[in-house]
Amino acid sequence: MRVGSKGAGVSLNLGTKTIVRVKRGSKQRLRIGIGNQRVSSASVSREVVKIFLQRFHSVRNCDVEVEHEIGAPIGAGFGTSGAAALSLALALNEAMDLGMSRIEAAQVAHVAEVRCGTGLGTVIAETYGGLEIRVKPGAPGIGELVCVPVPKNLVVACHVFGPLSTRKFLSDPLTRSRINNLGGKMLKLLIEAPTIANFMKLSRRFAEHVGLITANVRALLDRADKAAIVCSMPMFGDCVFAMIDKNSIDEILRVFQEQQAGRTIISSVNQEGAQLLN
């Protein structure tokens, strides 16, 4: 659980909702759906359930049905695998009355995502929400982060072209070397001046250094630069994002709409982190 990452990011209200239905005393079975469609993959969600099965005898001999409603594009740098794992862990704990604390359930989600190679710092970020700086790696309760205040008038504007493989890039020695070489310096500069403007500036500098900017992202970044709007690229997604005053949203929409490919997403910032819904 001490494996993780340092870094920074922002959580969106355009999130993931997970519904869990449990039938006790049945033949052990797990069914997972995404958007009302049954899926055979969902490796991170299956790993979460596997960990629960290993730790709690009461989870065995249960028919578990999981339904993920994912609001953000999958695989495009929005942390959807971490969100699915986290929401599932919280929901399973509640549905089966397992008695874990919120942090303990979140730790299960973190371990599952690390094992599956789909993320290192996503779960802790989504546990607390907001704009966070992860200053010590690890699962929730072990890793440490600093929260940067985000005014309510700010929204996150994104233009999404498609997915990039987190697992592929986290296992690539060259990409990891580039991340590690500059990541610590960028984090130190952000901690020294923990502002939204500095976050966006350093995020862009980091994206340029890592070297994963696609042709579509480059074209849109250039247009945003000409319009004096600071944009960056999330790790890891074929996407462009900016944090902007919602009263000025038309300006960035004009820039995004010049790009024929992709789609635009606007979301407010989630300040509370993952929560159980009534």
Question: What residue ranges belong to the model's regions?
Answer:
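Solvent-exposed alpha-helices and their adjacent loops that cap or buttress functional pockets
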Residues: M1, G9-L12, S58-V59, C116-T118, ...
